[in-house]
Structures are given as C-alpha cells and as structure tokens.
C-alpha cells in the first residue's frame, strides 16, 4: 500500500512538473485577419485619389467641425498614444495598481512593435504622400522613405499607433474586465478610426495607407497582449512589472528595478 501511494505521489509530481506548452501566439484567426487587411488595402487603392481630392475640397477643409475633429484625433494618435500608454504605466506604478501597470506596459509594447514594422515598410516602399502629387497615388520608389518624410506615406504611422493602442487595451479588457470588453472596444476602436481618417483630411496619407496601418496596429496589439499573458515569465514583464516608482524625498520620482521570476 505504501509502495502504491508512493507511485501515485511520484506520478502526480511528474505531471505537475510537466507544464503544458503555451498556446500559439499567432493563430489561424490572426492569419485570416492579416489577409483581410491586405485585401482591404488593395481594394482601397483604386479610391485613393478620389478620396484625397474630396477631402481637400473647400467644403471639407473649411468645415470647422471636421477640422477640429481631425486636429483632436490626429494629436490623440501622435503623441497621444505614447502619452496614454506611458501614463497608464507610470500611474499604475505610483498607485501600485498591477492591472493599470499591465495595460500601460503592454499597450506601449504594442505601439513600439507596430511602429517598428511600419517604419521598415514605409522606408522600403518610399511612397509619396498625397501632398506631393495628389494625382499620382502610385508613386513608389524602394528605399526612398529613408531620405524624406514626404515619401513615408505607406503605411500611416498615426493609424498603426492608434489601432495598436485600441487593440491592446481591448485585448487586456478581456483579461481584466471581460464584461466591459465590448464597450471598451467600441470606444477605443472608434477613436482609432477617427485618428486614421484625420490623415487623409490633412493630405498626409492615402486611404490605403491608413487601412494597412490599422491592420498592422490591430495585429500588433492582439499578438503582444496574447504573448505576454501566455508567457508571464518573459523578461519584459519580469523587469518592468517588477519596477517600483515612488515620489522622491527631494521632489520628482525615484525609480528602482526589482526583477522578479
């Protein structure tokens, strides 16, 4: 009987020590989503010039409501997304709110990941912005985006940042506030959409630029949050979620890193 009990205990211990592998970060659903955004980008291209010309007509450019809305949501995307992500992280550290810290850190990571991908693509594509020549949405030249901001049109950095934040915050809501995820998603994605549309209004991007940017940002947010939550022992979380931020005696804040396992 003792031998049997020992065998059961040994088997239980071995089972406990054999952790189940984490689920895949990139799923079939993500593949379909990526393909959908690529298709949407291609479908948007025939309408690039038409929308650009419509947006620049006096009726739209002199509309105070459209102009003010575009300004607000353009700034919400840049620098707003960085301020929001970083602000949530710092506020979470100061108030010792793990959830707020988590959301701020992971949304900031998503913005960085999307921005890096966007920089690589726009630098290589070298697409001219509509303000360069509104009659030529097909003006691409490999590598030209490295030389001038006028040729960094494809994809939109504002759109990808706004959608990365929206996607990450919505994904985090599924872990922390599942009953409010739909509402949070509607608000954040709604704001991201208006941020994206501000770019054609400002004659800075074509329609297809913002569609691709939205796709990159959305995927970045989903993948970053999923990876972080299925790999909780990753070095980013160990370092930055273990960091403490507190008011310094002489003013300002004191920062200390406490890497955890």
Named regions from a protein language model:
Residues 40-52:
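Alpha-helical transmembrane segments of multi-pass membrane proteins
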Residues 34-43, 85:
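Short, glycine/alanine-rich hydrophobic alpha-helices that insert into or span membranes
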Residues 86-88, 118:
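Interfacial helix-capping/hinge residues at the ends of transmembrane alpha-helices
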Residues 50-61:
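Interfacial/capping segments of alpha-helical transmembrane domains
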Residues 17, 61-65:
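Flexible, solvent-exposed coil segments and beta strand-coil junctions
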Residues 64-86:
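Interfacial helix-start motif at the membrane-water boundary
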């Amino acid at each position: 009987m003792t031998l049997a009990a020992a065998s059961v205990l040994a088997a239980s211990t071995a089972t406990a020590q054999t952790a189940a592998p984490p689920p895949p970060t990139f799923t079939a659903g993500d593949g379909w989503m990526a393909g959908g955004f690529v298709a949407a980008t291609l479908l948007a291209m025939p309408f690039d010039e038409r929308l650009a010309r419509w947006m620049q007509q006096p009726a739209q450019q002199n509309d105070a409501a459209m102009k003010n809305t575009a300004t607000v949501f353009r700034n919400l995307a840049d620098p707003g997304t960085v301020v929001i992500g970083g602000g949530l992280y710092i506020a979470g550290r100061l108030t010792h709110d793990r959830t707020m810290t988590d959301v701020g850190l992971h949304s900031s990571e998503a913005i960085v990941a999307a921005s890096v991908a966007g920089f690589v693509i726009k630098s290589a594509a070298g697409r001219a912005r509509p303000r360069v020549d509104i009659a030529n949405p097909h003006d691409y030249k490999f590598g030209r985006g490295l030389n001038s901001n006028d040729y960094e049109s494809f994809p939109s950095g504002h759109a990808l940042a706004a959608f990365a934040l929206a996607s990450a915050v919505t994904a985090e809501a599924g872990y922390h506030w599942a009953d409010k995820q739909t509402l949070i998603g509607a608000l954040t994605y709604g704001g991201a959409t208006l941020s994206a549309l501000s770019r054609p209004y400002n004659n800075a991007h074509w329609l297809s630029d913002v569609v691709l940017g939205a796709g990159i940002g959305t995927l970045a947010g989903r993948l970053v949050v999923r990876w972080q939550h299925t790999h909780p022992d990753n070095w980013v979380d160990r370092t930055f979620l273990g960091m403490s931020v507190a008011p310094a005696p002489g003013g300002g804040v004191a920062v200390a890193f406490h890497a955890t396992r």
